Regions:
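Short Cys/His-rich Zn2+-coordinating modules
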Residues: 1-8, 16, 67-70
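Local cysteine-cluster metal-coordination motifs and their immediate loop/turn environment
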Residues: 15-37, 80-92
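A broadly conserved sequence feature marking short terminus-proximal activation segments
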Residues: 1-10, 23-56
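Conserved Radical SAM active-site core
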Residues: 39-172
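Residue-identity detector for glutamine
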Residues: 7, 11-14, 90, 96
Length: 173
C-alpha cells in the first residue's frame, strides 16, 4: 500500500479523500466508494498500488483514439476499482470487484511496466484503461512520469469523474 494523495484529516482516524467528487469521508479500517482507497489510522492508502488486473498491447484505435498515432499499438494496463457503478459496465468484474487478497497478488513496479512497454518495437507508450484509472492515481502518475521521461506517450481511458482534470477522452465502459 502507498499513502494516497488528495486527502485531508477530518478528525482522529477519519479522513476525506478529495480525489473525485464523491469526497468520501473514510473511517479507520474502511474504504471509499471505489473500494481501493482505505483509511488506516487516519491516513488514506492506495491498496492497489502496483497491482495489475489486466494488461496487453492494443491498437490505439481500441481506446478509442483515432487521430492519436493511428495504426500504432499501446501497452494497456488496468487494476481494480471504480468511482462509479454503471449498470452497463463491460469490465464490471474488475471495476466492481473488491478482492480481499490484494497482498497475495503479483505487484509490478513502474519500472517493470515501462520496460515491458518498451520491449515492443511498434508500441508508442502506455494506456491506463480497463477499470477507472483515476482511482489508481498515484501508481498511474508514477508510471506516466517514468514513461514520459523515456519518450513514451501516455493515454487515460476514463469516466472523467475526478477533481483534478479539466478535459479527457471520456468513455463509460
Amino acid at each position: 500500500m502507498k499513502i494516497a494523495r488528495y486527502q485531508e484529516t477530518i478528525q482522529r482516524y477519519q479522513s476525506r479523500c478529495n480525489l473525485c467528487p464523491h469526497n468520501c469521508v473514510i473511517a479507520d479500517g474502511k474504504s471509499g466508494r471505489c473500494h481501493v482507497r482505505e483509511n488506516s489510522e487516519g491516513d488514506i492508502y492506495l491498496k492497489t498500488y502496483g497491482i495489475v488486473s489486466s494488461m496487453g498491447f492494443d491498437p490505439i484505435e481500441k481506446k478509442p483514439l483515432y487521430h492519436f498515432h493511428p495504426g500504432k499499438y499501446i501497452f494497456s494496463i488496468g487494476s481494480f476499482g471504480c468511482n462509479l457503478k454503471c449498470r452497463f459496465c463491460q469490465n464490471w468484474e474488475i471495476s466492481q470487484s473488491v478482492p480481499d487478497h490484494y497482498s497475495k497478488m503479483k505487484h509490478f513496479s513502474p519500472e517493470e511496466l515501462v520496460s515491458m512497454a518498451a520491449e515492443r518495437r511498434d508500441n508508442i507508450g502506455i494506456a491506463f484503461t480497463y477499470n477507472e484509472p483515476a482511482v489508481w492515481f498515484e501508481f498511474m502518475m508514477d508510471i506516466a512520469a517514468l514513461a514520459k521521461s523515456r519518450g513514451m506517450k501516455t493515454a487515460m481511458v476514463t469516466n472523467g469523474f475526478i477533481n483534478l482534470f479539466n478535459g479527457a477522452n471520456v468513455t463509460l465502459k
